[in-house]
Amino acid sequence: MGSLVEFCGEVRRETQKAYLVFDGAHETWLPKSMIKSERVVASSIKDDRIFEIPEWLAREKGIV
């Protein structure tokens, strides 16, 4: 398995297969099948979550 990257963003929309996530500057779709873990940011008023995704996907989506 390749390297993983943590990515924090607000879930703006959800479908059966993906989340539309806003990182403060850009929106991007994250396929649920590629998310290795996710956790809710406890102090968040919005639906902020921390996702762990493959580094190659983060690069492809312009996250890193």
Can you describe what each PLM-predicted range is?
Residues 1-64:
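Catalytic phosphate/metal-binding cores of nucleic-acid and nucleotide-processing enzymes, i.e., regions
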